[in-house]
A protein has these predicted regions:
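Amphipathic alpha-helical dimerization/coiled-coil segments
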Residues: 87-115
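C-terminal all-alpha effector/ligand-binding and dimerization domain
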Residues: 149-207
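Hydrophobic, amphipathic alpha-helical faces that serve as interaction scaffolds
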Residues: 83-94, 118-159, 163, 191
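Short linear motifs at protein or domain termini
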Residues: 1-93, 97
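Solenoid-repeat scaffolds in large eukaryotic assemblies
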Residues: 103-104, 133-136, 174-180
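Hydrophobic side-chain positions on well-ordered alpha-helices
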Residues: 18, 23, 125-127, 167-171
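A ubiquitous short alpha-helical element
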Residues: 1, 74-76, 105-108, 125, ...
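Long, contiguous secondary-structure blocks with strong helical propensity
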Residues: 2-10, 115-122, 145
């Protein structure tokens, strides 16, 4: 049992990173047997790992259809963006309430904007020093990771937008970061119909 648990924990981490990296598209099925073959393991730890990802909202398990990357409706995606915004704004409030002990460490340079966005939001959550809040941000951040990959081409000036967020964070300018985060998520809520349609089109190309 310990070997199975260890293997399933390893697989959980690998598949989670694959989802964040956009290896699987929203709506795409993940076949446990294929994953087991790729990692040369049995189905049991694979199913444990996939079920754990279902519990965290990164996958869904549909009757007779198996494990899939969630394909949100317009309402669900708006709710997800709204929730992410509220969590990050709350984290900023916690951080602003404390004296600045040291300047935030610079974010490592990377042209991968979805990855850098995940890292920045995770850092904001972690620096709030509130375990439950950081946990909620981490899970919501993970749920949005595959969506960020799928819709990246729809966002104009994404690099400049991320630079504005990082600049406000590095300056410890919480009012500016608050307003920039709100504007960031408002733009995405306005694009929800286009994002959902784009993801549906990409999913149809899988068949």
């Amino acid at each position: 049992m310990n070997a199975i648990h260890s293997k399933s924990s390893y697989l959980y981490g690998q598949i989670r990173r694959d989802l964040q990296a956009g290896r699987y598209l929203p709506g795409q099925r993940i076949d446990p047997a294929t994953v087991a073959g790729e990692y040369r393991t049995s189905l049991t730890p694979v199913r444990f790992a996939l079920s754990r990802l279902v519990g965290y909202g990164m996958l869904c398990d549909q009757p007779r259809a198996g494990f899939h990357v969630p394909m949100p409706t317009e309402m669900q995606l708006r709710d997800l963006y709204d929730w992410m915004e509220r969590l990050l704004v709350m984290a900023c409030e916690f951080t602003a309430a404390r004296p600045l002990e040291a300047a935030p460490a610079p974010m490592p340079g990377d042209d991968d904007i979805p990855k850098q966005t995940w890292k920045l939001f995770d850092t904001i959550g972690r620096q709030a020093r509130h375990g439950a809040l950081h946990h909620a941000i981490k899970r919501t951040n993970d749920r949005l990771a595959a969506i960020r990959r799928a819709k990246h081409a729809l966002i104009d000036h994404a690099a400049e937008e991320l630079a504005d967020l990082e600049g406000a964070w590095q300056a410890h300018d919480m009012p500016r970061l608050d307003s920039t985060l709100r504007a960031y998520h408002q733009r995405r809520r306005q694009l929800v119909p286009c994002i959902v349609a784009h993801m549906a089109e990409r999913r149809s190309q899988l068949h």
